[in-house]
C-alpha cells in the first residue's frame, strides 16, 4: 500500500509536509464512494468546497463513473508509431535467429505489424498513451489542484484527492482512484488487443481479434444499473464454463449455465459467447477468463459491511450439534494424520490409547503399520489421542513475519481510522482523540521500535488463554480490484494477534499439513502444475470426473464449537497450553470495525459502539484469511466422511474454499448417479458443520477442470496468457515507480504469462510490443525516433549493464538461465549479423566501462555478474537511506543495535576475504557468503525496501527525495543514450564461440579467471537437424526426439502418451542434512548448512586452514560454541553448484504440452552421457530447447513426421569439469557480526568418526539396500488412485545412474534381502509386494529397472551368477522381480548369502547415504561390460547339439541365418526392424560381426534389443551412429523380401535332408536368388552361453531340479497367502512340470486341471478334488520346450525323482 492524499491532513503526518498529492500511479486501493457522497452532503473541508464549485447540473454518481469514461473519443492518429513496428520486427528477428528458430520469423512479423496497424488496436493504444501522460503529470505533484486537462472530448479537473470529469453538460465527481481505475482499464484493453492479435496469428483457428472487439463493444453498450452491469461482468467467466460443460460433458450432465441471467439481461453478449462456443470451446474459455478489462465496480460499503457482519454471526446449527460434529471430524483427522505419518516415517506418532480402544489399533501401532481396514472404520480413532509431535517455533524468523502488513497498534487507536469532520457531520459531536498514536501502524515499524524483540512474551497470553483487552480489536479493510459489488474484507489486527496468526499457521503448515493428502498448501508451483496436468488428464480418459464445490462465504462459516475439539488435539500435539483453543474463541471477545474513513461508528467513552454496519462487538469468526490452514483441514475432513459414507473412491484437492473432488467411476453405478449421491452427501455434511453448500452452483464435469485459477479443458491447460497480459501493471508496490522497476515488473509479468500458456511465443512477442510502448511513454522523441538505437537498447540486458528487457528473458523458454552472459553476447552477435547495426552503435549503447576496483560484494551476490561501472539505481540509494534511518532511530531495540554495525562494509570485507580463493570459484564464494550473519542482515534490509513505512518512520527520507532520485535516474539513462561516446570496444567478444567470449569478458572485467560460472548458450551448443538425410557424424553426439505420430497444429493443444516434461527433477545439490537435536530457527538452519558444507568440503578433500578459520567464525557468530561437528546427512554436489535449494523441480518457462508427443533421451550423447565425468551441459535446457524447436516448426505451418535430433555442434562449448579443490590464500579478516536471534544453538551429543575406516562403497551399498527395501514397503501401501506424484519414499531418484554404477550391487541386493527377512512382513504386505513386482509397477521397481538397464550391473549381482540356474525367468523385468522375491522363493539360500556381509557394517546409518555415495565416487569402479556367447558355426566343427533360443519359435530360423553369415564370411550385416528381435539378438552375439540396424533416426528397436540382452553384446556389437543414420542397407541384410544383398529364408514343405548338426533343416537360404549351401556347417564349442539366449534353468539336469523344487515350495507358500492371484504362478510352475514329465518319458497332456486351496491350515495343490473347499484351475496349450530333449538324454536313470517332496512327485507322474 502506498500513501494517499490523506497525507495532507495535519493529524496524520509525523511532521509538516510539503504537500505531495495523488501519490499513486496505478490502482492499489478499493473504489469507495463515501468521500464523494460526504463531499456532496457537506461542505466542511476546503478542497471539498472547491470541488463542488466545478460540478455541472447533471452530475453522475461516482459509482457510474464508467458510463462517462466509455464516451471518451480521441482524434485519430495523434502519435506516430511507425518506428515501434519496425523496431519490434527487428528485435523479434534477432531473438528468433539467435535461437536458430528462423521459421518463426514470418509468423511473428505479420502478427506484430497487424497488431500495431489495425485501426481499432491503434486507437486503443493511443488512448492508453494519453491516459498515461496525464497520470504522469498529475501524480506526485506539489500543486494541490491541477487542471483542466484534456483527454479527447473529456476535460478533467484534479482537486487534491478528488477528480471532476466533464463531457459536454454531464459531470461526474469521483476520487482519484476512480480515474486510475479508468486508466487501468484502458491499459488493460490495449494489452488485451495486442496479445489477442499475436495469439491469433500463432494458433490453428486463426485470428479472433474481431470477436474481442465485438465483445468490448457489446459490453460497452450495456445500459443497466450499476449492480446489474457488474453482475453480468462477473458471470461471464462461469457462464462460459457452464456453456462448455453443457456441450462437451460426456458421462455427467451439467446445467450450471442455467444459474446465470446473461441470456435475459444481455442477449447480444449471450449470442456472442455461444458463437465462440461453436468456433472453439478453448477460445471461449480463454476470452471469458479476462475479467479486468471491463472497469471495476465501486464497493457499496453500507450493504456490503452489513452483510459481512451478519454472516460473521448467523447460526445455521445449534452450538451443541456443532460441538458433537466437531468430535466426529476429530476422529477422521486423527486417522488421516496417523496414516500420513506412517507412510512418511514408517512408524506411528506418539499416541495415547484410551480405555476401550480397539485391539486392531493396538496391534497396528506395535507393528508400526497402517491397516487398510482403518479407512472404513475411522470411528475407532475417537479412542486415540496423538501426543506431542513437535514444539511450537516460538521465535520465528523475521523474514516470515515482516511482510509489509498494516497493523493497528492498539485498541485506543481506532479513532485514527476515521475523519473527524465526517464524525461531526454524522453525530454532531466532536470525535475525541488521543494527542498521538500509541504506536506504529506497520509491522516493519514495530520491528524497528523493538516491539518484536521478545516474541515469546507477546505470545504468552495465548498460552494461558487470556488475551489483553487492548489487543482485541480488528479493522475490516475492503479488498481492492474485486468484481464483487458488496466487496470482500480483510482483517487488520493488532501486533500480538498478527504474530499469533503467523506462528499458528506456520506450525500447521510445517508439522501437520505435510501428512495430509487432501490439499495443495505445501506444494511447490511446479509440483502443482504436474499434479493438475495429471488430474485433468485422468478426468478426460473417462475413469473419473470432477466435482467443483462452491461454499457460500466459506471464511465466515467456521464457529468456535466446531473448531474446539481439533484445536484441543493440536494443543496436545504441540504441547502448548491453550494456544490453538484461544484462537477459536478469540472473535467472541473482539470488536470489529469497518475501515471506511468517512463513515465512522459512534464513540462512547472512547469505545466504538455496535451498530451492525460499521461496528460489531463480538462475533463467531475472525474474517477472511485468518485461520485458512486450520479451516482447510476441517473442510477436507467432512468431505472425506461424506464420500466414505456413500462408498465411492475419490481424491480431494483443496486449498481454502477452492475445493475439487475427483470421483472414480464404479462398476455398479453410472457417473451421473454417483455425482448426485456425492453432492447430496456433501451438502448434508457441510450443513452439519454449519456451512452452506450452494448445490446449484457446484458443477460436475468430465471435460473441464479448474483449480486455483488454472483451467484445463480435456486435459490441456487453457492458455492464460490473455488473462495475464491484460493484467500487466507496472506497479511493484515500489515506494516510487522508476523506469528500472517499471520495466523489471513488465518483464516479470511476461514471464508469468508464459508460465500460464502452452507456448512461450505469445508472451515473448506481446512482451516486446508492450515494452516498446512503455518506453514510448517514458523516453523523449529523440530516442524513440531512432530505430536502430531503439532496437539495440532493447537487446542490451542487465547482464552487461542495460535495462531489464523481455528480449534477454530466456526465461520465457526456461525459468531462469544458469548463465545469462553467453546468451546476451549471442543476441548482440546476431544483431550485427542480421541488421545493419554497426558495432560502434552497440558500443555506444552498452558503454561498457570497467569499474575502477573490483566490487567483490556484487560477485558474491550474483556469481554471473560483470565488474562494470553502471548508473546508480534508485533502489540502491534508497537502501542507503534506509540503513541510515534505522541507525538513527531513537529506539533501543535488537534490530537497531544490529543495524548499528556497518553492515555493508562488513559484507564487503567478507567478500574480499573470499576473493582470495585460488582458483576463484564465485559459486563457492556465494555459498560461503550466504552462511554468514551479514548476508542475513542484508536480506532483512531488503524487507524494508518495498515498504513505504520506513519513509514515514524516519525523519531522514522525504517522499520528495525519492521522487527526485527517480527522475535523476531516468535523466541519466537518457543522457547516456544521447551521448555519442563509446565505451570499451565489444568487437572481439562478438565473434566466434560465445562460451569462450563470455569467459574472456569475465576475465577482462574482474582481472582474474573465474572458474565454474560460465555455461554455454544452448542454441549455440546444439543445433537441430531433421533425421532425413542426417549423416552418421551427426549421431556421434546427439539427443534424439521421436514423435509419437505425425505432429500437426492440433497436437499443440492435445495430450500425447509421453510424460509431460517441465524439466527433470534435478537432484538436490547439497542435501539438507537433518542434524539431530538442533533447535528449529533460522540460526540453527544456517549453522546446519555451515556444518553440511564443512563436512562436504572434507569429503572433497578441501583441507585449508583459512577455510576452517572462516567456518569456525561463521559458527561462533551464531552462538554455536560446541566442538562437536555433528554427523550430517549431507550430499552430492553436482556441477560445482553448492546451492542449498532443495530439489528444483522443473525449469521450463511454459507448460510444455508438446513434450507429451515426443520421446527423447540423452543416451546417444556418447562422449558425454556415458562417461562418468561432468561436462558443461545443462540437460534441462537442452531437452526443452528440443521441444521448443518442434513447437516452432508446427506453429509456423510445418509438420513433424520423422524423428529429429539436436546434435552437438560447437566443440568449444563442451568443457570437462575438473576437480573442485580450492584454498583461501590469506588469513580471513572478517570477525563475525552480531546476531539477531537470542536463542543459543546447541548440538546434543558428541559424535565419533568410527565409520571412517569402512569402505565407503560397501557402506553406501548396504544403506541403499535398506532404503530400497523401505521404499518397497511404502509402495505396497500406496493406492493406485493416489494423486500425488509417484516418487520413491527414500527419494532414490536423486542418485544418478553413474553414481549407482560405481557400487557393488551384489552387496546392495544382499542388504535388501536382509532387510526383507528382518521386516517380518504381514500377509497382506507379502501379497502386495508379490502383486506389485509381478505387475512391474511402482516407483521403486522403476528405479531398479533403470539401474539394471546396464546389463553389466545386473550380472555383477554376484549371487546372480550362482543363483540364476534356479530362477525360471522370461525377461529382464521378470528376473529383477524374482531376484527381489528370492527370500520368499528360497529362504535357505538367501540366509547363507546374507551372512556374507561383514557384520560391522550393520552399524552404518542410512542417514549418511549421501556422504557415502560422495566418497564412493572417487574410489568406486564401474563393472566392465563382458560379452557372452551364442552357439556358432564353422565349416569343420564338432557337433554338440546346444542351440540358442531353444524355447522359441524362431530357433531354427536363427541357426540357419548364423550358418549363412559364417558361410559368406560376413563382417557387416544390416538388420531391418521387421526382423524378430530374438533373431537379431542372437546375431548380435556372433563375434567379429558388426551389426548395423536400419533405424532411420528412431532408436526404439535398438532399445528393445538392449532390454532383451543380458550381457554387453548388443551395446558393443551394434554400430549405433551408423544404425541411426541408416535408412536403407549398403551390403548384406536380412529383413526385406527382395533386393540386392538380401539374405532370405524359404520354408521347405517337407524336410528334404538331414543336416549334420540340425536334425532336420526347415529352411533353404538364398542370397539374392542364389541358394547358399550350408550343408557342411557344423558347431563350434560353446563356453559361456548368454543367459538371454540359453535359459540357465535348462542348462543342466541339476539346475532344472533345483528350479523345480524352489518353484514348487514358492507356489505352496503363495497358496497360503490371502489376496494373491495364484494363476500366473501356477502356469509358470506347470511349464517346468511339463519339461519334467517329458524327461521322465511321461505322456504330456495338452490340458490339465489343478485343484488349489488350504485345508486344515496346510496348502494343497492336487490333480483330484479331494476336498470341497478347493478351487479349480485349468491350464491348457501345454507342450514341452525343445530344451527338454537335451535334458532327457542326460537323465538316463530317472535320477530326477530322487529326493523330491512327495506332493511334487505325485504331480510329475501322470496316472
Curated annotation (Swiss-Prot):
A motif (Nuclear localization signal) lies at residues 844-852. Keywords: ATP-binding, Host nucleus, Methyltransferase, mRNA capping, mRNA processing, Multifunctional enzyme, Nucleotide-binding, Nucleotidyltransferase, RNA-directed RNA polymerase, S-adenosyl-L-methionine, Transferase, Viral RNA replication, Virion. GO terms for cellular component: host cell nucleus; virion component. Residues 543-715 form the RdRp catalytic domain. Pfam families: Mononeg_mRNAcap, Mononeg_RNA_pol. Its main location: virion. Coiled coil: none annotated. It comes from the Viruses. Displays RNA-directed RNA polymerase activity. The viral mRNA guanylyl transferase displays a different biochemical reaction than the cellular enzyme. The template is composed of the viral RNA tightly encapsidated by the nucleoprotein (N). Functions either as transcriptase or as replicase. The transcriptase synthesizes subsequently three subgenomic RNAs, assuring their capping and polyadenylation by a stuttering mechanism. In replicase mode, the polymerase replicates the whole viral genome without recognizing the transcriptional signals. This is RNA-directed RNA polymerase L. Interacts with the P protein. PROSITE patterns: RDRP_SSRNA_NEG_NONSEG.
Amino acid at each position: 500500500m502506498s500513501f494517499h492524499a490523506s497525507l495532507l491532513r495535519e493529524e496524520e503526518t509525523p511532521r509538516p509536509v510539503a504537500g505531495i498529492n495523488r501519490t499513486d500511479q496505478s490502482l492499489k486501493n478499493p473504489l469507495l464512494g463515501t468521500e464523494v457522497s460526504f463531499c456532496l452532503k457537506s461542505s466542511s473541508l476546503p478542497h471539498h468546497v472547491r470541488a463542488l464549485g466545478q460540478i455541472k447540473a447533471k452530475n453522475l454518481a461516482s459509482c457510474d463513473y464508467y458510463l462517462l469514461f466509455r464516451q471518451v473519443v480521441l482524434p485519430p492518429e495523434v502519435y506516430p508509431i511507425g518506428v515501434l513496428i519496425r523496431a519490434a520486427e527487428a528485435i523479434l528477428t534477432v531473438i528468433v535467429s539467435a535461437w536458430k528458430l528462423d521459421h518463426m520469423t514470418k509468423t511473428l512479423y505479420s502478427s506484430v505489424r497487424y497488431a500495431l496497424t489495425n485501426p481499432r488496436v491503434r486507437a486503443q493504444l493511443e488512448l492508453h498513451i494519453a491516459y498515461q501522460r496525464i497520470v504522469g503529470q498529475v501524480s506526485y505533484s506539489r500543486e494541490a489542484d491541477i487542471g483542466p486537462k484534456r483527454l479527447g472530448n473529456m476535460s478533467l479537473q484534479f482537486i487534491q484527492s478528488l477528480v471532476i470529469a466533464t463531457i459536454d453538460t454531464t459531470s461526474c465527481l469521483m476520487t482519484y482512484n476512480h480515474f486510475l481505475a479508468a486508466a487501468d482499464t484502458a491499459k488493460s484493453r490495449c494489452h488485451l488487443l495486442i496479445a489477442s492479435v499475436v495469439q491469433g496469428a500463432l494458433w490453428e483457428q486463426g485470428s479472433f481479434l474481431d470477436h474481442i472487439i465485438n465483445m468490448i463493444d457489446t459490453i460497452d453498450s450495456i445500459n443497466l444499473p450499476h449492480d446489474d452491469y457488474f453482475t453480468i461482468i462477473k458471470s461471464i467467466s462461469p457462464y462460459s464454463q457452464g456453456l462448455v460443460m453443457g456441450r462437451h460433458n460426456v458421462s455427467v450432465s451439467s446445467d450450471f449455465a442455467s444459474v446465470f441471467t446473461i441470456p435475459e439481461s444481455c442477449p447480444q453478449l449471450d449470442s456472442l459467447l455461444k458463437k465462440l462456443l461453436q468456433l472453439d470451446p478453448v477460445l471461449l474459455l480463454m476470452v471469458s477468463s479476462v475479467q479486468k478489462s471491463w472497469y471495476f465496480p465501486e464497493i457499496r460499503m453500507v450493504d456490503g459491511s452489513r452483510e459481512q457482519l451478519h454472516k460473521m454471526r448467523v447460526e445455521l446449527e445449534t452450538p451443541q450439534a456443532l460441538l458433537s460434529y466437531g468430535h466426529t471430524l476429530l476422529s477422521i483427522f486423527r486417522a488421516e494424520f496417523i496414516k500420513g505419518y506412517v507412510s512418511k516415517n514408517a512408524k506411528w506418532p506418539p499416541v495415547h490409547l484410551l480405555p476401550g480402544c480397539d485391539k486392531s489399533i493396538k496391534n497396528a501401532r506395535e507393528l508400526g503399520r497402517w491397516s487398510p481396514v482403518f479407512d472404513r472404520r475411522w470411528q475407532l480413532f475417537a479412542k486415540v489421542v496423538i501426543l506431542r509431535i513437535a514444539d511450537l517455533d516460538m521465535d520465528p524468523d523475521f523474514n516470515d513475519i515482516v511482510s509489509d502488513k498494516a497493523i493497528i497498534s492498539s485498541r485506543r487507536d481506532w479513532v485514527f481510522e476515521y475523519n473527524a469532520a465526517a464524525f461531526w457531520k454524522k453525530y454532531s459531536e466532536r470525535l475525541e482523540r488521543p494527542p498521538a498514536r500509541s504506536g506504529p501502524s506497520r509491522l516493519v515499524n514495530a520491528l524497528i521500535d523493538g516491539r518484536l524483540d521478545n516474541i515469546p512474551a507477546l505470545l504468552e497470553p495465548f498460552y494461558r488463554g487470556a488475551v489483553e483487552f487492548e489487543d482485541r480489536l480488528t479493522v475490516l479493510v475492503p479488498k481492492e480490484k474485486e468484481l464483487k459489488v458488496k466487496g470482500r474484507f480483510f482483517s487488520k489486527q493488532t501486533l500480538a494477534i498478527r504474530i499469533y496468526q503467523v506462528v499458528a499457521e506456520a506450525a500447521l503448515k510445517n508439522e501437520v499439513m505435510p501428512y495430509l493428502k487432501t490439499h495443495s498448501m505445501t506444494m511447490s508451483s511446479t509440483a502443482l502444475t504436474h499434479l493438475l496436468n495429471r488430474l485433468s488428464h485422468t478426468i478426460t480418459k473417462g475413469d473419473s470426473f470432477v466435482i467443483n464445490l462452491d461454499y457460500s462465504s466459506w471464511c465466515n462459516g467456521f464457529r468456535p464449537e466446531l473448531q474446539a475439539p481439533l484445536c484441543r488435539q493440536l494443543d496436545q500435539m504441540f504441547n502448548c497450553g491453550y494456544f490453538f483453543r484461544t484462537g477459536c474463541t478469540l472473535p467472541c471477545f473482539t470488536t470489529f470495525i469497518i475501515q471506511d474513513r468517512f463513515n465512522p461508528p459512534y464513540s462512547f467513552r472512547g469505545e466504538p459502539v455496535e451498530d451492525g454496519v460499521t461496528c460489531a462487538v463480538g462475533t463467531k469468526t475472525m474474517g477472511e484469511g485468518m485461520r485458512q490452514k486450520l479451516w482447510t483441514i476441517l473442510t477436507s475432513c467432512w468431505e472425506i466422511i461424506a464420500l466414505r459414507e456413500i462408498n465411492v473412491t475419490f481424491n480431494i484437492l483443496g486449498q481454502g474454499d477452492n475445493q475439487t473432488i475427483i470421483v472414480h467411476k464404479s462398476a455398479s453405478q453410472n457417473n451421473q448417479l454417483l455425482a448426485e449421491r456425492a453432492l447430496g452427501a456433501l451438502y448434508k455434511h457441510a450443513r452439519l458443520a454449519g456451512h452452506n453448500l450452494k448445490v446449484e452452483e457446484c458443477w460436475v464435469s468430465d471435460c473441464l477442470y479448474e483449480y486455483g485459477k488454472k483451467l484445463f479443458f480435456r486435459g490441456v491447460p487453457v492458455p492464460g496468457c490473455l488473462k495475464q497480459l491484460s493484467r500487466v501493471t507496472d506497479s511493484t508496490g515500489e515506494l516510487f515507480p522508476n523506469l528500472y522497476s517499471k520495466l523489471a515488473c513488465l518483464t516479470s509479468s511476461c514471464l508469468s504469462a508464459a508460465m500460464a500458456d502452452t507456448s512461450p511465443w505469445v508472451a515473448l512477442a506481446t512482451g516486446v510490443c508492450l515494452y516498446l510502448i512503455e518506453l514510448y511513454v517514458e523516453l523523449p522523441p529523440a530516442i524513440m525516433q531512432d530505430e536502430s538505437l531503439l532496437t539495440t537498447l532493447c537487446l542490451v540486458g542487465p547482464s552487461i549493464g542495460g535495462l531489464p528487457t523481455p528480449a534477454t528473458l530466456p526465461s520465457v523458454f526456461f525459468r531462469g538461465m544458469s548463465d545469462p552472459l553467453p546468451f546476451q553476447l549471442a543476441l548482440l552477435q546476431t544483431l550485427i549479423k542480421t541488421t545493419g547495426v554497426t558495432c560502434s552503435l552497440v558500443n555506444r549503447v552498452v558503454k561498457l566501462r570497467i569499474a575502477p576496483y573490483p566490487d567483490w560484494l556484487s560477485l558474491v551476490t550474483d556469481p554471473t555478474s560483470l565488474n562494470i561501472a553502471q548508473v546508480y539505481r534508485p533502489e540502491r540509494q534508497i537502501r542507503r537511506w534506509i540503513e541510515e534511518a534505522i541507525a538513527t532511530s531513537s529506539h533501543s531495540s535488537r534490530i537497531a543495535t544490529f543495524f548499528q554495525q556497518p553492515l555493508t562494509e562488513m559484507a564487503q570485507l567478507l567478500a574480499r576475504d573470499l576473493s582470495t580463493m585460488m582458483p576463484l570459484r564465485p559459486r563457492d564464494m556465494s555459498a560461503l557468503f550466504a552462511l554468514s550473519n551479514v548476508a542475513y542482515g542484508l536480506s532483512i534490509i531488503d524487507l524494508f525496501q518495498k515498504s513505504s513505512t520506513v519513509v514515514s518512520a524516519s525523519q531522514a527520507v522525504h517522499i520528495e527525495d525519492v521522487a527526485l532520485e527517480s527522475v535523476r535516474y531516468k535523466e541519466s539513462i537518457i543522457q547516456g543514450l544521447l551521448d555519442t561516446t563509446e565505451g570499451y570496444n565489444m568487437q572481439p567478444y562478438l565473434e566466434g564461440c560465445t562460451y569462450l567470449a563470455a569467459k574472456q569478458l569475465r576475465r577482462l572485467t574482474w582481472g582474474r579467471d573465474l572458474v565454474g560460472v560460465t555455461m554455454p548458450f544452448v542454441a549455440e551448443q546444439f543445433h537441430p537437424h531433421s533425421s532425413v538425410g542426417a549423416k552418421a557424424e551427426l549421431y556421434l553426439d546427439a539427443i534424439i526426439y521421436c514423435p509419437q505420430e505425425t505432429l500437426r497444429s492440433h497436437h499443440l493443444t492435445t495430450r500425447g502418451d509421453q510424460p509431460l516434461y517441465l524439466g527433470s527433477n534435478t537432484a538436490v545439490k547439497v542435501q539438507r542434512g537433518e542434524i539431530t537435536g538442533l533447535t528449529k530457527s533460522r540460526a540453527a538452519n544456517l549453522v546446519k548448512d555451515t556444518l553440511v558444507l564443512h563436512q562436504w568440503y572434507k569429503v572433497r578433500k578441501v583441507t585449508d586452514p583459512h577455510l576452517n578459520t572462516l567456518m569456525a567464525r561463521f559458527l561462533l557468530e551464531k552462538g554455536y560454541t560446541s566442538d562437536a561437528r555433528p554427523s550430517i546427512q549431507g550430499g552430492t554436489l553436482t556441477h560445482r553448484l553448492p546451492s542449498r535449494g532443495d530439489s528444483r523441480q522443473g525449469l521450463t518457462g511454459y507448460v510444455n504440452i508438446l513434450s507429451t508427443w515426443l520421446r527423447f533421451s540423452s543416451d546417444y550423447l556418447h562422449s558425454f552421457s556415458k562417461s562418468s565425468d561432468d561436462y558443461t551441459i545443462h540437460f534441462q535446457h537442452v531437452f526443452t530447447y528440443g521441444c521448443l524447436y518442434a513447437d516452432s516448426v508446427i506453429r509456423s505451418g510445418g509438420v513433424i513426421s520423422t524423428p529429429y535430433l539436436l546434435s552437438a555442434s560447437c566443440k568449444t562449448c563442451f568443457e570437462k569439469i575438473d576437480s573442485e579443490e580450492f584454498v583461501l590464500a590469506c588469513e580471513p579478516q572478517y570477525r563475525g557480526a552480531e546476531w539477531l536471534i537470542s536463542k543459543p544453538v546447541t548440538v546434543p551429543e558428541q559424535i565419533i568418526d568410527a565409520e571412517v575406516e569402512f569402505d565407503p562403497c560397501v557402506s553406501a551399498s548396504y544403506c541403499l539396500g535398506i532404503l530400497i527395501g523401505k521404499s518397497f514397503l511404502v509402495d505396497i501401501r500406496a493406492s493406485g488412485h493416489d494423486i500425488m506424484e509417484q516418487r520413491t519414499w527414500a527419494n532414490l531418484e536423486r542418485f544418478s545412474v553413474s553414481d549407482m554404477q560405481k557400487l557393488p550391487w551384489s552387496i546392495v541386493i544382499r542388504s535388501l534381502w536382509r532387510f526383507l527377512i528382518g521386516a517380518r512382513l504381514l500377509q497382506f504386505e507379502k501379497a502386495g509386494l508379490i502383486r506389485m513386482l509381478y505387475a512391474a509397477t511402482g516407483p521403486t521397481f522403476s528405479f531398479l529397472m533403470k539401474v539394471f538397464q546396464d546389463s553389466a550391473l545386473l550380472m555383477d549381482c554376484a549371487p546372480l551368477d550362482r543363483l540364476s540356474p534356479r530362477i525360471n525367468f522370461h525377461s529382464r523385468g521378470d528376473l529383477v522381480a524374482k531376484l527381489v522375491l528370492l527370500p520368499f522363493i528360497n529362504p535357505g539360500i538367501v540366509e547363507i548369502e546374507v551372512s556374507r556381509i561383514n557384520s560391522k557394517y550393520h552399524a552404518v546409518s542410512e542417514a549418511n547415504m549421501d556422504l557415502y555415495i560422495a566418497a564412493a565416487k572417487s574410489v568406486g569402479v564401474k563393472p566392465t561390460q563382458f560379452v557372452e556367447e551364442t552357439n556358432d558355426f564353422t565349416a569343420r566343427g564338432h557337433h554338440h547339439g546346444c542351440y540358442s533360443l531353444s524355447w522359441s519359435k524362431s530357433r531354427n530360423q536363427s541357426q540357419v541365418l548364423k550358418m549363412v553369415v559364417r558361410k559368406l564370411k560376413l563382417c557387416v550385416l544390416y538388420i531391418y526392424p521387421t526382423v524378430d528381435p530374438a533373431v537379431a539378438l542372437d546375431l548380435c552375439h556372433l563375434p567379429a560381426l558388426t551389426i548395423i540396424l536400419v533405424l532411420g533416426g528412431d532408436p526404439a528397436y535398438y532399445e528393445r534389443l538392449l532390454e532383451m540382452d543380458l550381457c554387453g553384446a548388443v551395446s558393443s556389437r551394434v554400430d549405433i551412429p551408423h544404425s541411426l543414420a541408416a535408412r536403407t542397407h549398403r551390403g548384406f541384410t536380412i529383413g526385406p523380401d527382395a533386393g540386392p544383398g538380401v539374405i532370405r529364408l524359404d520354408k521347405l514343405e517337407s524336410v528334404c535332408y538331414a543336416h549334420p548338426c540340425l536334425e532336420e533343416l526347415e529352411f533353404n537360404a538364398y542370397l539374392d536368388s542364389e541358394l547358399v549351401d550350408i550343408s557342411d556347417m557344423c558347431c563350434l564349442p560353446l563356453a559361456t552361453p548368454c543367459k538371454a539366449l540359453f535359459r540357465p534353468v535348462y542348462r543342466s539336469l541339476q539346475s532344472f531340479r533345483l528350479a523345480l523344487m524352489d518353484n514348487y515350495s514358492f507356489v505352496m507358500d503363495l497358496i497360503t497367502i490371502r489376496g494373491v492371484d495364484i494363476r500366473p504362478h501356477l502356469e509358470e510352475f506347470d511349464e517346468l512340470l511339463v519339461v519334467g514329465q517329458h524327461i521322465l518319458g511321461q505322456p504330456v497332456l495338452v490340458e490339465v486341471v489343478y485343484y488349489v486351496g488350504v485345508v486344515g491350515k496346510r496348502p494343497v495343490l492336487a490333480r483330484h478334488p479331494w476336498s470341497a473347499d478347493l478351487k479349480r484351475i485349468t491350464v491348457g496349450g501345454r507342450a514341452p520346450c525343445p530344451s527338454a530333449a537335451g535334458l532327457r538324454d542326460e537323465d538316463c536313470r530317472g535320477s530326477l525323482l530322487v529326493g523330491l517332496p512327495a506332493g511334487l512327485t505325485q504331480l510329475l507322474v501322470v496316472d
